[in-house]
């Protein structure tokens, strides 16, 4: 059946080249004329650059004498071990062909490799599982690769709570079990025992978790604030998924097949990263919607890949003149079709909702790798990042990153005009940066680097590719061959580490190549498309339509076995995203959806598959939000999670800027005097007792989340200081009436230390201690007093007065009165507590069974100035 003709929209995608030489955004406009001999910031990607050779630092006579013989000796050992490794791998292949894959299972395996559609592949994989007895392994719940007892207990608990309509109980249970690789359910080993699927107990657990998340999303007995805090917490714990596309020159075009397989299964993650050739594929993915990608991922895509079309005579002459095989300006113009012209990272994220990440390395040897995305470089042009990521020494010269300013003009991304080159030299897969910026806890790596592809060997099987013999429990080629393969590979890594640590490798083309083999090239799930020997002869050539068709098919087939694992992961991840998206929308419109099957809202109906732009959870986003909240608090605007709003004390305390250089808090009301109360009337403090009353019952989840850690207190701290009281009483008798010059500073220090360990609020920060208006620290319970002012009952066993020395407590009344008058003259509002409290009075109060507490509005209480922190 002939393919249907492309639509008009699809035809426009093929015909538009997004290049306008007269436009100020054109790469040609940034280059100097050919006769110009030098580089400037106005022409940052021009290639005619003459560099001065840097003088090498002398390492000593011994280093210079031994360096080269040692380097040649290590490379000779590497050559011998590499030859042994290749021979070992070939012996394993012959063993599997002669012993493991024989008879009917060999026939099924051949059908599996020739499958043209995913449905055909699934049917063949099910036949293989049934023939090899892997279905029995799926039915058995017990297994040593995951905590099956915990998974069964959690699943039963979730089912019972959901049937009982206990929403808050579900939220507490989900907060524990919604974690990345909970109880080993996401382990690669759980998906390496069969050709398709995993244990039925694991799949039932994942379905129950997703159903419970949808139940919490549509529940009506829980406030929106509780839902928002819950989904934010579980999203932080579970994390997000990322698709990482490696480099590999023309081998990187296998990524298009991997992308097509995930696209047709609707399992594309929102975070995409690419390096070198993978950056070109990632740019095409993140600048098109799903419907547009389905029209482009066809063999005709090879017509748009023309970067290596120059004949030998042209590029050889260019290499002698510039030191690079390809022209930067020409590559920039050809790559603009993949990036939709001069799109920036922020514009691409706004259009498709996918976070594009491209890894580049500064030309400086000691500068760290940089991950460019809509957070770190929002205005950077994607085509300049692709050129920098593909700038392999000898292939393409280092490039200056370009960016758009506020007026839409193009300028260098950094003021210094630093140049960047291929990120594969140091960090081909930037997993650390992805976890830090996007909270990515699950990585899907498509690895096509030709120098690394050979070393990927799974001795116990990989996802969707179990070991054929011993019902999946054996070793590939037997234990001896698998052990020999691992030993040789680890020994090769050891030799490369010696070369790197001893700095034996010289710089080739002004680049350090010592760490090329020492990076991490794998992820939680690693896909390695099967290349051919012919690919090595076309490593720097453009593919034609037949080659692109084969690459698309090979990339799809290598991704099909992993779709089951990715689908289970995305089931929970998207259930969390649905909850965050709908709660965010409901907070804006004060409504929620009652349909559990409600799909994610889309900002543009034409963006099929594009998610609502709920911010991807990241520490960078949190930093921006925290900074903006602090700015709003300084300007006095409302909003934000300030300590006053969290404790419902925003109307009680306000900033006092009267003190010089110190931010203080003061009360708006006249305050609460100290009165005595028998100890027997105080409520008993239990380990689960919340020290601060929340605003409403709806905020119980946000306030009590993590009670086991917030209510840890040290009620016996003052008792530890009792041995020192006698010493202080003996030594202070001669200085009872003498005021030390630094007594106020000592009192401030001692009071701060005491309040740090026995703080009133949930946090131990100094800012929240100041929020309590100078009240002495200790275990406190909040209750509503007169005019909405909360009163605090203090535990006398932790009162900070007991930590003060007697020479600071036994001041004369005249000195105290003068101090309070000076405080009033500075404009501070006095609060109760001015009566002088000595150590003898505290001991007498404790002996009589009474304690001191502040009580707002008590009759007959003297309203005297307070003992303020630092007074």
Curated annotation (Swiss-Prot):
Q: TM segments?
A: 68-88
- UniProt biased composition (Low complexity): 23-33, 721-748
Compositionally biased region (Polar residues): 594-606, 687-706
UniProt GO molecular function: triacylglycerol lipase activity
Instruction: Give the active-site positions.
Output: 276 (nucleophile), 422 (proton acceptor)
The entry's cellular-component GO terms read: membrane
Bilayer disposition of the protein: Single-pass membrane protein
What InterPro entries does the database record attribute to this sequence? Acyl_Trfase/lysoPLipase (IPR016035), NTE (IPR050301), PNPLA_dom (IPR002641), Triacylglycerol_lipase_N (IPR021771)
The UniProt annotation puts the region (Disordered) at 20-53, 586-707, 720-748, 760-871
Q: Where is the composition biased (Basic and acidic residues)?
A: 798-820
Primary localization class, coarse: membrane
Locate the motif GXSXG: 274-278
One of the GO biological process terms: lipid catabolic process
EC number(s) from the headed UniProt entry: 3.1.1.-
Q: Where in the cell is it found?
A: Membrane
* Annotated PNPLA domain residues: 243-435
Keyword tRNA-binding among record annotations: no
Listed A to Z, the keywords are: Hydrolase, Lipid degradation, Lipid metabolism, Membrane, Transmembrane, Transmembrane helix
What family classification does the UniProt entry report for this protein?
Belongs to the PLPL family.
* Function per UniProt: Probable lipid hydrolase.
The protein in question is named Patatin-like phospholipase domain-containing protein CNBE2340
